[in-house]
Regions:
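Loop/turn-to-beta-strand initiation segments
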Residues: 28-29, 56-57, 83-86, 124-133
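Phosphate-binding/switch loop-helix module in NTP-utilizing enzymes
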Residues: 61-126
Length: 198
């Protein structure tokens, strides 16, 4: 399971769409849980002239609440076939209300989010599928840095974690936070263009 996190406008949804398009171009189908309201125009730009054909190979869920997101995640396993090559959840945390206090609602929300991520991790392992989740950030007052929402549960389950950062007008940086075999801190700059990430 791969987690991609970053502030708003850092390129998370662009990356998720581009991964889905490339997966379809390689002959596989995609299951895509969209909580970010993908722009059809942006999808057409990234997918190119075959956008309609590519879109037919992407199974999209568009939940409107955390509960609907949970239902969509649970529905995924019924759709698994040898044609599925990628599962995307963009964003896993948009309906999740991050609360620093430990009230009962906050604890329940954390547990439900952990259950969803754990379920996706189980599907990834069982069916040998790639699962990509995008994640939002919060500002950690103690360190003065942006950190992914969801805490250590999502971090532990994610085998690869990539942070996307804004570095300028249209330019971004992808920084490796966690990987099994590559050193942390490795970074690559890229641009967001009409055709996707370059």
């Amino acid at each position: 399971m791969t987690q991609v996190f970053g502030e708003a406008g850092s390129g998370k949804t662009n990356l998720c769409m581009q991964l889905a398009v490339e997966c379809v171009k390689n002959g596989k189908k995609v299951i895509y849980i969209d909580t970010e309201a993908i722009s059809p125009q942006r999808f057409r730009q990234i997918a190119g002239e075959n956008a309609k054909e590519i879109a037919r190979e992407i199974i999209i869920f568009e939940p409107n609440s955390f509960e609907e997101q949970y239902s969509a995640v649970k529905e995924i396993e019924k759709l698994i076939s040898d044609r599925i090559g990628l599962i995307v959840v963009d964003s896993a945390t948009s309906f999740y209300r991050f609360e620093l206090d430990q009230d009962e609602s906050s604890i329940r929300s954390r547990r439900e989010l952990s259950n969803q991520i754990g379920f996706l991790h189980g599907i990834a392992r069982k069916y040998r599928l790639t699962v990509v989740i995008s994640n939002q950030v919060y500002s950690d007052m103690a360190s003065g840095t942006l950190k992914p929402i969801g805490g250590s549960g999502i971090e532990h389950i994610s085998k690869t974690i990539i942070q996307l950062e804004k570095t300028g007008e249209g330019t971004r940086r992808a920084k490796l936070w966690k990987h099994r075999s590559l050193p942390e801190g490795r970074a690559r700059d890229f641009r967001i263009t009409n055709e996707g990430l370059r």
